Amino acid sequence: MMGWWSSGANNALDEQIDKATSSSLEDIALNLEISDIIRSKTVQPKEAMRSLKKRINNKNPNTQLSALNLTDTCVKNGGAHFLAEIASREFMESLVSLLKAVGPGTVNAEVRAKILELIQSWATAAEGRYELGYIGEVYKTLQREGYQFPPRVTVASSMIDSNAPPEWVDSDVCMRCRTAFTFTNRKHHCRNCGNCFDQQCSTKSLPLPHLGILQAVRVDDGCYAKLTDKSSKASGAPPERSFTYSSSPAKPKGSSMQPRNARVDDGFDEDLKKALAMSLEEVKSHSRGYVSSPAANGVTSNQPKPNGHAAPKAVEEEDEDLKAAIAASLADMEEQKKQHAAALKQQASGAASSSSAAPSALPKNDYELTPLEAENINLFSTLVDRLQTQPPGTILREPQIQELYDSIGALRPKLARTYGETMSKHDTLLDLHARLSTVVRYYDRMLEERLSKAYSQHSIGGYNLPPPRQAPGPYPSLQPNAPPAAGPAENFYTGEQQQEYSHPTTHQPYPQPTLAQYGAYDKRGSVSAPSSNQYPPQQVPQHTGNWGPASSAQQYGQQPSYPPNEPPQTAQLQQTPNPAHLSAPAPAPNDSIGTTPTADPSASFYFSSQAQQQQQQQQQQQQQQQQQPQQVPSSPPDPNMSPYPNLAQPLHSYQPSLPQTPASIPAQPSQPQQAHQAPPQAQQPYWQHSAAQQTQLPPVWQPPPSAAYAGYTQESFPSAPHHAPKQPVVEESLIDL
């Protein structure tokens, strides 16, 4: 609003005030025009107050009286913002100074009386208003000082009340459509309410005489509708029922308000009016062959005429057409009901055949809304929403809304039935969904039970097996029904097998026995009769007359067969046993170690002190068992027995093979691989050695403690030492025997 105030406007106001306060007769029209200028805030209220004060301080009493009358008119019509300037100390002290002036500056008695009258009336009208309280203080002060006021006249406070343009309100968005202001979407203020609007919401312009604004200024759409509605009511133009908005009679020239047709054309969009017209035409065209002649020309006949008057016949014809359309719609609904009832009866009786039912489609349910009815409902909802921003009486002057309301009101039972059917369908679908969910849940449970049952059966057949067998070592056992070994040399292997003959695994296939179980363990006995459970149960050979075809011979190489009646000595003379086979059991096919601990300098490193203690105890037990009578095998031995020779025979039969000199000891480590690759040329069965042992019992040869055979374990094979261990001393006396 500061843009309104300019020096040009102030100069124009000064000229008008000078003209109104001239010494001629008072011009009331000019006074009201000046008050409207002040009220419209075209000029600053302070500048207007100072212009009036200047004219009041004039030396001409007539000018002073005219200025006082003009000031009173402006106080009563200038608005609250001008009243605040009149009640200021600057203006009131100027009036008091005129009252107290003495000497040449004394004012005229009429001017003096007029000033006291105005102060008294203004103070009476401003009672109870805080912003105008200084006028009352001046009035009371003058009363105390003894100034004689004229008789008091009761003046209502409404005398000084006048509408003025409100203060402008600032905002970042449009206060109607909430669109943000940008560089292109500029901000505009409504002169009627002072709010912020954008361009599309404040395109209207109207003069505001109630605010003292006589020229057309910018207003928003809401204020425009309110002001034009008030103006149409004030003009006394009766509302007209027409297809579209018709113009009202022309206003007198003195009225600056726009006619009603301008408001109507701007208030509603053209497309909305076209939609209304098309909807009504469609309703009429869908009736049962009913086409009225006025209906075809209804849109053109109901358009506003140039003179602003609509034909009354068009209104009557429109009402008749609407009645006919409603009647046709009701008749169509009744016919649909009858068709639906007939279709239901036909389905119940079962008389309709598939051939006859194919060409004729079932009619729609009478409770279903047609697309046209749904469109009318949506259109009516849109119109009602648009009416929220229209003046209160707009709904009474819109025949289209009334017609839509009547037609939609007839659809309420149909809509209620549609809603009920939809709810029943919804409940049915919910019930079916619950049943389906239950069935699916039962089916899933059944599948889970079947799967679990199948898995359990499969686990019994293949996955739930008993514990795995013990991992076989290098000397697995034979069949449990193998015949026992003959001779006292096999007594050591009748018990549990030593754990040293197997690789240490997670499962202990061979438990560790105590040392007391090895009753007749010595160097010779361990070689002559190994335990029957040291060999894998691959095949159980048949009892034959010779040893060669046995299955165990396939593991340890081809061995010569001897008849049972051959003397042991003859076999011993023909045999030249290898010391590697005499001192250690034959290895498994996957084992390359076959030398004796005493003959191999590298192998003697692998025996611990525990093995030495074990050997000493076994030698003592062997001496006790050798005193007992030994049995000679009366029948050929079981081919399942070990093919190793029994070294318990007289030592003179194999003296050439046992003596070893220190010079020959270093050459022994190369024999194990050769012994494993090539079998010996001649080797005696163990029963011949047993027979020779019974004939002659030589003194027992005590081997050194370090020569005891403790078996092979996984811990017994570290990296071969690079130094030659100390060899035990061999007794020469035993060699001479």
Curated annotation (Swiss-Prot):
Residues 243-259, 294-305, 528-560, 568-578, 592-609, 686-697 have a biased composition (Polar residues). Component of the ESCRT-0 complex composed of HSE1 and VPS27. GO terms for biological process: protein targeting to vacuole; protein transport to vacuole involved in ubiquitin-dependent protein catabolic process via the multivesicular body sorting pathway. The FYVE domain is involved in the binding to phosphatidylinositol 3-phosphate (PtdIns(3)P) which is required for the association to endosomal membranes. Both IUM domains are necessary for efficient binding to ubiquitin. This is Vacuolar protein sorting-associated protein 27. The gene is VPS27. It is found in: Endosome membrane. It comes from the Eukaryota.
